[in-house]
Amino acid sequence: KDKTRNGILLIVDGDQLEDDADGIMDHIYIENCYIHDVDGPNDWNDTFTGGIIFNVIGSTIRPNTSFRDLRIANNTIRKVDLLGITGYVDMVRGNYQAAIGPNNLWMRDIYIGHNYMEDIGQGGIDLCDAMNAVVEYNVVDGFLKRYPSFRPTVALYPWKSENAVFQFNE
């Protein structure tokens, strides 16, 4: 369990883009997938692993680099570590909020709906750095299965997000 593994991994790497390239990745839909048996670290670390992961990375802040209109729907995710579904911006260190907005790094118009998750190492959905996201009609049947008990968590949560709607989830 010392390896970093993911079921589906989406990366926008600011370091790999040409200076004048559009860094916004639009209209990516992940639907009707079965993701299962993804082992990973079960302790707190700087690398989130799991079922469906979408990250914005880079060694420096690159404005206008992110996801827009990302849809994750009707998927089944079973026995994954650490998270069922998560996305975050990792080109900003320290005070995330201070740089996300002014540099247009928000992940915008994210939809996560109608997914079924069970036997999740930590949390079902950890949505970070998102604006105008909707998370609805998801079911998490068993979370915090292999995560150390000293670090409490919840099944679904926004982190450093604005105008995120979480509704009708179980």
Predicted regions, residues:
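Extracellular beta-strand-rich solenoid/capping regions of secreted or surface-exposed proteins
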Residues: 1-26, 45-63
